[in-house]
């Protein structure tokens, strides 16, 4: 049994027949598409004499509803300058997008944000089957922002029921930034307060330490003076009221000895400021040691401050 290429003669003839079949099929499909497009043309449904108001610094947008059947057309925005509509250049502050979550797809022009120079009339257009279709114009009135901006709310497109106020997201974006700043400043303020308290405590302790050092030194001097004075007083105490001092050789060699004891007590407890004891001893003459015996003389004075 002969195959199809054999029946056609050669493989080259079979390839040409296949290409001809694809060409005829594409022509038929194109005619059907054109027929559908003619039955359902593209429509740009912007209401005539549409007007909108905006304030500088707001996030603003205008919408162009587009009706189509099969293929989404290529739509552009332009701004009227006299009798000419100048196409807009896309930038981060001025860009377009499609919103197809509605019953009618919408081609949107975004102002992020809007300025006084954006004041004017805008329209959208498309090229459909070698024919340019223009929409009605939308006029935007841009005014300076004042302090009491709540008296002049943003006006949206009247012919689109689902249009939203573009100034809302800006406040929502500002609130997280302010909250983050507040959460950052609170711990920083608490840390500074804690550091100030620690520095104040260290300063007070240092002052108290300086005040304690002179009193400690005075106590040490008093103790050092009291110990030899008491021991010496006990050593030189008389055995009886009428007895004579038994002076040691060292004390007898001195013509006159004077011992002064100064005591300084704490300011709030003791009233005695100082006490002095003068002890005068007439030394023995070693040459007349056997013939003469001299009695010592001593006296004490006490001063009390009220």
Swiss-Prot record:
What does the annotation give as the result of altering residue 91 to G?
Answer: In strain: 129/SvEv
Protein's name according to its UniProt entry = B- and T-lymphocyte attenuator
Its principal location? membrane
Q: How does it assemble?
A: Interacts with tyrosine phosphatases PTPN6/SHP-1 and PTPN11/SHP-2. Interacts with TNFRSF14/HVEM (via cysteine-rich domain 1).
Q: Which residue ranges does the entry give as Extracellular-facing topology?
A: 30-183
Note the coiled coil stretches, chain numbering.
none
Renumbered to this chain, the signal peptide range is: 1-29
Does the entry annotate any disulfide bonds, and if so which pairs? 40-69, 64-124, 78-85
Q: What is the effect of changing residue 136 to D?
A: Loss of interaction with TNFRSF14
Superkingdom of this protein's organism: Eukaryota
Which PANTHER family does the protein's record reference?
A: B- AND T-LYMPHOCYTE ATTENUATOR
| InterPro entries membership | BTLA, Ig-like_dom, Ig-like_dom_sf, Ig-like_fold, Ig_sub
Q: What SMART domains does its record include?
A: IG (SM00409)
PTM annotation, UniProt: Phosphorylated on Tyr residues by TNFRSF14 and by antigen receptors cross-linking, both inducing association with PTPN6 and PTPN11.
Q: Which GO terms describe its cellular component?
A: external side of plasma membrane; plasma membrane
Residues covered by the Ig-like V-type domain: 37-139
Q: What are this entry's molecular-function GO terms? A: signaling receptor activity
For biological process, the GO terms are: adaptive immune response; cell surface receptor signaling pathway; immune response-regulating cell surface receptor signaling pathway; negative regulation of alpha-beta T cell proliferation; negative regulation of B cell proliferation; negative regulation of T cell proliferation
Question: Which residues lie toward the Cytoplasmic compartment?
Answer: 205-306
Q: In which tissues is it expressed?
A: Expressed in splenic T- and B-cells as well as lymph node tissues but very weakly in somatic tissues. Also expressed in macrophages, NK cells and dendritic cells. A polymorphic tissue distribution between several strains is seen.
Task: Note the Gene3D superfamilies from the entry.
Answer: Immunoglobulins (2.60.40.10)
The free-text function statement in the UniProt record for this protein reads:
Inhibitory receptor on lymphocytes that negatively regulates antigen receptor signaling via PTPN6/SHP-1 and PTPN11/SHP-2. May interact in cis (on the same cell) or in trans (on other cells) with TNFRSF14. In cis interactions, appears to play an immune regulatory role inhibiting in trans interactions in naive T cells to maintain a resting state. In trans interactions, can predominate during adaptive immune response to provide survival signals to effector T cells.
- TM stretches of this protein: 184-204
* Phenotype seen when the gene is deleted: Mice exhibit no developmental defects in T- or B-cells in thymus or bone marrow, but increased antibody responses and sensitivity to antigen-induced 'experimental autoimmune encephalomyelitis'. T-cells lacking Btla show increased proliferation with a heightened response to anti-CD3 and a slightly greater response to stimulation with anti-IgM.
Q: What results from changing residue 274 to F? A: No change of phosphorylation implicated in interaction with PTPN6 and PTPN11. Severe reduction of phosphorylation
Q: What is the annotated localization of this protein? A: Cell membrane
């Amino acid at each position: 049994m002969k195959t199809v290429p054999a029946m056609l003669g050669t493989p080259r003839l079979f390839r040409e027949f296949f290409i001809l079949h694809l060409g005829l099929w594409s022509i038929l499909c194109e005619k059907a598409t054109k027929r559908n497009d003619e039955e359902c043309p593209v429509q740009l449904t912007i209401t005539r004499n549409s007007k909108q108001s905006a304030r500088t610094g707001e996030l603003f947008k205008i919408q162009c509803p587009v009706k189509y059947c099969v293929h989404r057309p290529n739509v552009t925005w332009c701004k009227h300058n006299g009798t000419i509509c100048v196409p807009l250049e896309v930038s981060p502050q001025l860009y377009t997008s499609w919103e197809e979550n509605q019953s009618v797809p919408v081609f949107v022009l975004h102002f992020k944000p809007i300025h006084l120079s954006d004041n004017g009339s805008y329209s959208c257009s498309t090229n459909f089957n070698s024919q340019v279709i223009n929409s009605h114009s939308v006029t935007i009135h841009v005014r300076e922002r004042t302090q009491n901006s709540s008296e002049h709310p943003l006006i949206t497109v009247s012919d689109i029921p689902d249009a939203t106020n573009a100034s809302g997201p800006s406040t929502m974006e500002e609130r997280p930034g302010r909250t983050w700043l507040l959460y950052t400043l609170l711990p920083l303020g608490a840390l500074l307060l804690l550091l100030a308290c620690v520095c104040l405590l260290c300063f007070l302790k240092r002052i108290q330490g300086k005040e304690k050092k002179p009193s400690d030194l005075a106590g040490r001097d008093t103790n050092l003076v009291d110990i030899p004075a008491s021991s010496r007083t006990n050593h030189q105490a008389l055995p009886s009221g009428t007895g004579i001092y038994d002076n040691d050789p060292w004390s007898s060699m001195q013509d006159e000895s004077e011992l002064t004891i100064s005591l300084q007590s704490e300011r709030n407890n003791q009233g005695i400021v100082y006490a002095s004891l003068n002890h005068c001893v007439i030394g023995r003459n070693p040459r007349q040691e056997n013939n003469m015996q001299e009695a010592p003389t001593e006296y004490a004075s006490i001063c009390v401050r009220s």
